[in-house]
Amino acid sequence: MRRLWGRLSAVLAAGVMACAVLPVSAQTVDPDFDLGRFRALRIEAARAVQAKEWDKAVAASDEALIIMPSSGAVLLLSAQARAGAGKAAEAKASLRDYLARGMVVSKSSYPQLSPLWDAKLDQQLMANSEPIGTFKSVQRHAALSVAEGLAIEAKSGKTYLSALSRGAVNIVNNGVLNPLHSLPEGVGAYGLALRGDDLWVATSSGAVTKGYDPAKPAVAEVLQIDRLSGQVKARFTDEATPRRFGDIFAGKTDLYVSDGQKGEVLRLSNYSGGFEVLIPEGYMGSPQGLVENEAGNVLIVSDYSSGLYRINLDSGDMDRLEAPANITLLGIDGLARHGNDLIAVQNGIKPDRILRLRLSADWKTISRAETLVRGGEGLREPTGLQVVGNKLIFIARSQWSDVGADGTPLSVTPGPAIVGEIDLERIPKSVPRFSEPDARQPRP
């Protein structure tokens, strides 16, 4: 693994930045760093393919793959460029790499690659679409809520689910959803995290929530709620910068929340005071899930558009984790820890899947990746997750697929929200057989 972004490491090592000093403009990705350079090269390769400038397309896609070798979009551009340049063997190798990472593709969308397909590649493509593994359905909720976040009180097993459709934090009593805390119209509840008797909730206004009015100022708050009474104990917001909060994580000493609109990760030190910017704008396209190691000195953040990042909370160093050759780390949403392993919800790669990533002791490298569950009828747009003992509890079917971008139901009888369970000690090892998102839309 190589050291990324020295300037960012210096910023973080010198101390986090106050929110008030940041500009309020739309998200800008720094062109001098990995994500900015990668995006520029990807655009260059795509334009060159369109213009049939094959040598230029090959060069640009090669440079982009040096930065991000598991990018499905660029692997396909590489295959197209090489096919156009008459380098059939190299083009086939790019296509083989793409499929080896478990991704699927519509063959009809890439007619120029038709001569490359053979029985072995067809077999791999078909295998990549097949379901893997199973999970136990432990809750089914028929009412349309669009469940995003989940939190479990470990001792009692009490389940809390966030809802976007009508903006609420719900508690499950005897298998039935009951509102614990309702939000103002147009404001949805996203990530949830429990710490003692406090339920921390990331909230944001958005089109999917009933009553949303784009003419009104955007709302983004983290709420500290008494999990028993549902009363708000404290509110935390950033008055200086428009935000859209998504995932949240209750760390050993600090709280973290991702802002998918601004591309930043914020920290609430000691669970009090004001937000500090841990990862500033320019380095991630759409930060999502967050999780600390057991010691609480390393934070892993998933960027939907570029993979997983390791932040040393003592030194401020940030490095991107390299994907094993048989997976891509793009499109990962929620994260949780089981021992030294990471459990990841990957809903940006189809079919949807739940992964277990075996990490080195220092969390600097991924030694192996396993697909716990992939596809199947009950797994659709999975979202929030939590490990309780040796069980993974997760939102297997969130109902995101049942609503349009404006929150309108797509059917008079939407499917249920499903909470699933996986016994992490009994799952057999599996080989992941894994197109590529830039950001979760319309989620934060």
Where are these regions (language model features)?
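Short, conserved, GDST-rich strand-edge loop motifs in beta-rich repeat architectures
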Residues: 202-218, 397-416
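Beta-strand-rich domains and repeat architectures in extracellular enzymes and scaffolds
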Residues: 132-170, 415
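Short loop/turn segments immediately following the C-termini of beta-strands
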Residues: 164, 204-206, 260-262, 303-304, ...
